[in-house]
Amino acid sequence: MKRILHSQVIPLEDVPLEDSQRTDGSRGLDVLVVDDELIIADTLAMILSRSGYRAGAAYDGSSAMQLARLHRPGLVITDVVMPGMTGIELALALETTVPECKVLLFSGQATTIDLLWKAREMGRDFTILSKPIHPADMIRRVSEYIQPAMHDSYATVN
């Protein structure tokens, strides 16, 4: 049975594992959205969910890493500038933890350029989208990375 959770924050340990804790390497989530602005993370995850993706949201890099290990998303969309772990630090950590996961960065801050140059100096090149982004443009960009699973599921986790 699929559960639909709309904009409800639930503790990480309460996330249902029926579809996500898999030993065969299959994904529990298609897309994980990470942003310290809850309304942005929740809204993007909801838009993706309504477009057929199994989408979840996290509000910081640490929670995102836990969810990525558990749910093995095909794509993580992360804000670049966040307290604690930046989106670029998250992307680099995901390379070793969940290597099959692709990362798409998005930001509305000019300081992002400095972070991207630092990443490029380390030999990493990331795709970045500007905030705000029209929902149709986000769906189009996500579809370039991953196809929807066509399941109704959505969870926000902090």
Where do the protein language model's features map onto the residues?
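Receiver (REC) domain active-site loop signature in two-component systems and cognate sites
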Residues: 82
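Active-site residues of response regulator receiver
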Residues: 79, 107
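Short hydrophobic/Thr-rich beta-strand motif most characteristic of the beta2 strand and flanking loop
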Residues: 52-59, 67, 129
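Acidic catalytic/metal-coordinating carboxylates
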Residues: 59-63, 86-90
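Charged docking surfaces used in two-component/phosphorelay signaling
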Residues: 42-50
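Conserved phosphotransfer cores of two-component systems
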Residues: 69-71, 94-101, 121-123
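Alpha4 helix (beta4-alpha4-beta5 surface) of REC/receiver domains from two-component response regulators
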Residues: 89, 102, 110-130, 136-144
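Non-catalytic signal-transmission and effector/linker regions of two-component phosphorelay proteins
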Residues: 1-30, 134-158
